[in-house]
Amino acid sequence: PLRCEYCPNKRCHEPIYKEDGESICRGVRMLSPKELFDIVKIDDIYFQATGGGICFGGGEPTLYPEFIREFRAICGDRWKITLETCLVSSFAVKKSLCDVVDFWIADIKSIQSTIFHRYTKTQYSPMQMLSSLKKLIPQERVIVKVPIIPNYNTEESVDYDIAKIKQLFGFENVVKVRYQIIK
């Protein structure tokens, strides 16, 4: 849903299907939740020993809530499920995933609208996205990432965002990250 300049996964914006609407594009591999489970279950003992599991990330995993719910039904509670998300989904979708997802990593870009809109090329509200997360998920299950984005923000603006997120939303686990630009 976002169009971030430095997105490391440009493929998430490419079509899955060819123009006929049925044929899958080259390089795309469609998996059911069961097929994915069968691939990653090789790490079952490791996940159980470490308290680990699987992380669904970008593109935007909240675009596929049914897939995530089905995967949880297959793997059960023995694995942790984490979402790394930009939070661009409806309140209802996030709510439907509350009991399925153990941890949320929210990549918020910036709470300053001008920075957020310029970088993501969208008109979503980062404040509204954080507000819905606060209403739904206990803070101990949330990490908020605020990246330093070259040519878009500064260390100071990120520090400001982190302080405001803590103050306005009460999230304690807010971290500054540095984007590694892949060209």
Task: Specify the residue positions occupied by each region the protein language model found.
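Conserved AdoMet/S-adenosylmethionine-binding subsite of the radical SAM
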Residues: 37, 41-182
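Canonical Radical SAM [4Fe-4S] cluster-binding loop centered on the CxxxCxxC motif
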Residues: 1-30
